[in-house]
Amino acid sequence: MKSVQRHILFAATIALCLISCRHQAAPEPAEPQALSEYSEPSVPSKNSEPSTLSNPSNLSNPSNPSAPTSSPYAGGLEGVLASIPSSFVLLADVCPDIIQEIRYYTTYNFVGERIPGYERPVAYLTRQAADSLKLVCDDLKEQGYRLKVFDAYRPQMAVDFFVRWGSDLEDQRMKEYFYPDCPKSELFRRGYIAHKSGHTRGSTLDLTLFDMKTEREVDMGGTYDFLGETSHYNYSHGLTRDQINHRRILREAMMRHGFKPIAVEWWHFTLRNEPYPDHYFTFPIR
């Protein structure tokens, strides 16, 4: 009898334990771990030494120019816009007579490889800049010239790439052709390489004259994108009268129709009343 009572007592104890467990509150779920705050990439100060890159080919994949480029500056500029606004146009749609030789789509440039962001050899400009350039075309056609464009809108990703390339003092494969008289370590100080470019705002372009009679590019007394004094507009040492005159014809025609030049590059012009003076775009050229 006592044995039966012990078994009944044991069974009752087990039942009470089960009932108690069912009524216990489920533990509160753990608080999700907070995400760390996003911080903008830091831009090196003017006094800091640039980092040396051992292999510039790691910056981008030349066979796939749309591949993203790792850059300490990418996304760190105020006002960078990645989508193309409706006021940008293909230059060929507005000025079909213009010859386009987009150098940064090719390997014939001061870097020696296709530049990230240049996925097609075409030129984009803001509508305002393109319309003004059409007036320049009509003006010069009466003088027997066409325009030849080397670069127009330039994605910020390309500018970032130039900055990284400029910091790699070991890569000097194109020095003989584009900066033979300038140490690469001086390119930043002399203003040939910068963290920002007017091209990225969409109303700046690089161009030259094309002679309609000879069907040749006009001799300007210096090659496009040459990083040296011969590219300065007022450089005259060793230049012929025709070369100086050609520079003048291009500059005066551009200025008549609302473009402003710069002193250090005879080929570089920006629309005076550009629509995006404070924005730097980075959409790729497609």
Name every feature range the model reports, one short phrase each:
Residues 30-67:
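Compositionally biased, intrinsically disordered low-complexity segments enriched
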Residues 269:
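Conserved metal-phosphate-binding beta-hairpin within the catalytic cores
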Residues 2-3, 18, 37:
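General helical secondary-structure elements
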Residues 2, 22, 46-49:
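Polybasic, lysine/arginine-rich low-complexity segments
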Residues 21-35, 65-152, 159-160, 164-264, ...:
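Extracytoplasmic cell-surface/polysaccharide-interacting catalytic and binding patches
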Residues 10-19:
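Bacterial N-terminal signal peptides
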Residues 1-9:
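Bacterial N-terminal signal peptides that target proteins for export
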